[in-house]
A protein has these predicted regions:
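Catalytic core of DAGKc-family lipid kinases
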Residues: 4-125
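Residue-level signal for tight coil/turn positions that link beta-strands
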Residues: 57-58, 149, 198
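A generic structural signal for short beta-strands and their flanking turns/coil linkers
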Residues: 106-108, 123-125, 148-152, 190-192
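ATP/nucleoside-binding phosphotransfer catalytic cores, i.e., glycine-rich phosphate-binding loops
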Residues: 114-117, 121, 146, 156-199
Length: 199
């Protein structure tokens, strides 16, 4: 967000050394994970490339902006990571996901419009806007997202599945196969307006 306060002419190139727990943006960039020397070597040998970023209100994001059950899972993983660093990445996301799904959820009521189209009313369990394909330590939530196509990619549910189906979809998301479900939609877009009916 700090870099985006600068004009394009003043803005320096951004390089990353991926040492996080999920490292999904690093995956999108093809960076070496948890290998500082390897990642540094990639930066030294690499070339500058323009990639897209997303913006929600006045906040920019580089990989994921999500709402619904997945956002609750992300908040839980952040809290758990602060209290205990022994579980990281995919395992942390997976165990938090199973906990929330086992508790059951009717979704989060919202209204969404994609690219100025007609409003859609949803009970959102997932509403993930992606620059690249993965989050949660490698889950391919938007498997067809590309960081340089000039578009965001969104994944959302059109219906709330029963718990066994929800658990199955969660497992399929690791390989991006959940988007083949009739109740999951993935699409590319320029912009969206999302209004949640509860805070």
């Amino acid at each position: 967000n700090g870099l985006m306060t600068l004009s394009p002419e003043e803005r320096p190139a951004l390089g990353i050394i991926p040492m996080g727990s999920g490292n999904d943006y690093a995956r999108t960039l093809g960076m070496k994970i948890n290998d500082p020397e390897g990642a540094f070597a990639q930066l030294v040998r690499g070339k500058v490339k323009q990639l897209e970023i997303g913006r929600i209100n006045d906040v920019y994001f580089m990989e994921t902006m999500s709402f619904g059950l997945d956002a609750a899972i992300a908040a839980d993983t952040t809290k758990r990571r602060a209290n205990n660093s022994s579980t990281e990445g995919e395992a942390l996301f997976l165990t938090s996901g199973l906990k929330f799904m086992a508790a059951g959820s009717k979704g989060y009521p919202c209204t969404v419009s994609f690219d100025g189209e007609k409003d859609i009313d949803l009970q959102a369990l997932i509403m993930a806007f992606q620059i690249g394909p993965t989050y949660g330590g490698g889950f391919k939530v938007c498997p067809h997202a590309q960081p340089d196509d000039g578009l965001l990619t969104v994944c959302y549910n059109t219906k709330v599945p029963i718990i066994p189906h929800l658990l199955a979809l969660f497992g399929l998301a690791r390989a991006g196969k959940h988007v083949n479900s009739r109740i999951i939609k993935e699409r590319h877009l320029k912009q969206a307006v999302v209004t949640f009916h509860k805070p």
